[in-house]
Amino acid sequence: MTPDFTRFAAIDWSGAKGARHKGIAVALCDTGQEAPRLVSAPGGVWSRTDVADWLISTAGETPTLFGFDFSFAPPFVARGGYLPGDTVPDNGPDFWAYVDRLCPDEDLGAASLLEVAHRRHFYFGKADGVKADYMHNRACEALYLAGGGGKPSTVYDAIGAAQVAKASFAGMRLLHRVRGTVPIWPFDPLPVRGSLVVEIYT
């Protein structure tokens, strides 16, 4: 059964260091023909914590589908684990909790996971060796590529403007924070009625 959503939110996310992030934007639209509208950030510029608080506070107003443009989990099938060789949980929700406990970074940041705690899994430049050795994709991304959808980014690539690594691991901290209020698909069942968080990252 598909939930009957009456409102839709798209969140342009950021993994940048710091407390507030000009790269974050939140758009909202209702069913019907009206154009989406931008949601003003508290204080003029969004923080990741602001987004989490906003989602939690608005999710109960009306059934809303919240979409985030980051990867909800690293590849698992391709490598037999999220961070093979390291002792980490083997399912999404427990892994999000692990990331949140591990990272002392400001405003739900997660750069320390990539740069220190699990550094060997991430490509930061030529000193790390052959980049192709880090280019692991999730099963859905491999299918997307095989179908001609284009080359997906991987959370293990931590260099360049197009990298999604820092944003994705920061996003996992948000998922851990909001999961008690709003289910997160496909890790949680679809609600019969109510709000839901999904990934819209490709």
Language-model-derived ranges and their functions:
Residues 2-9, 13-202:
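RNase H-like (RuvC/DEDD) metal-dependent nuclease/polynucleotide-processing core
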